[in-house]
From Swiss-Prot:
This is Aliphatic sulfonates import ATP-binding protein SsuB 2. SMART domains: AAA. It catalyses: ATP + H2O + aliphatic sulfonate-[sulfonate-binding protein]Side 1 = ADP + phosphate + aliphatic sulfonateSide 2 + [sulfonate-binding protein]Side 1. The gene is ssuB2. Pfam families: ABC_tran. It is found in: Cell membrane. ATP binds at G34, R35, S36, G37, S38, G39, K40, S41. It is a peripheral membrane protein.
Length: 240
């Protein structure tokens, strides 16, 4: 599904990705952690083929059917919700597919709404609908819940898990939140200085509980891999 070997990317004289070997199977949910500047978004953009491949080298195989969700929903403000979802879709059933996707994310009846009439969480639901209506084989998500409040994040986590279980795309989620990574992912990667330093499989049943000893253990392993002092205050224990 996704395969990279010795993938390298850089900007000018600066090398950002230093030989990434990565495999993601269909239906597998992978989370990517790393400190700011470690190359997380660069790797995601490479997998989305949104970057200039001329700035790098290595093997890159990704499916042609892929979708990207960003922290900013990137909805067109002058287009209604349904029109945002089906933008670029062809076929007589495009509108019906768009309505079905909106129903999947809990926004049935909001097809005629303008983006400005939606909350931040609702806008991200539209962004998910826009991605999944295309039935992507690969879903790339770059901190999609970073700007949402805590309660909305919890709801969006549950929604994303449900949608991925139904549609079974390969998923790469870029996040700064270690708990989010352990909660959602089958595997968690840590990117450090442009290299994959950690690849941790999360062997926990779903739904996962933050209080479970196995959850806490995985969290501590990842925080240590990120170089976080486990004795530090709670607010410092994130992939800054």
């Amino acid at each position: 599904m996704v395969r990279t070997r010795e993938l390298r990317r850089g900007f000018g004289d600066r090398t950002v990705l230093r030989g990434i070997d990565l495999d993601i199977a269909r239906g597998e949910f992978v989370a990517l952690l790393g400190r700011s500047g470690s190359g997380k978004s660069t790797l995601l953009r490479a997998l989305a083929e949104l970057d200039d491949a001329g700035t790098g080298s290595g093997e890159l195989r990704v499916p042609s059917e892929r979708a990207v969700v960003f922290q900013d929903s990137r909805l067109l403000p002058w287009a209604r919700v349904l029109d945002n979802v089906i933008l670029g879709l062809s076929g007589a059933d495009a509108a019906a597919r768009g309505r079905a996707a909106l129903a999947e994310v809990g926004l049935a009846g909001r097809e005629r709404a303008w983006p400005r009439e939606l909350s931040g969480g609702e806008q991200q639901r539209v962004a998910l609908a826009r991605s999944l209506v295309r039935e992507p084989e690969l879903l790339l998500a770059d901190e999609p819940f970073g700007a949402l409040d805590a309660l909305t994040r919890i709801r969006m986590h549950a929604l994303l898990q449900d949608l991925c279980a139904r549609h079974k795309p390969a998923v790469l989620l870029v996040t700064h939140d270690v708990d989010e990574a352990v909660l959602l992912a089958d595997r968690v990667l840590v990117l450090q200085d442009g290299r994959l330093a950690t690849d941790l499989r999360i062997e926990l049943p779903r739904p996962r509980r933050h209080s479970a000893p196995e959850f806490i253990h995985a969290r501590e392993l990842l925080l240590a891999a990120l170089g976080v002092d486990l004795a530090a205050p709670e607010e410092e224990k994130q992939a800054s």
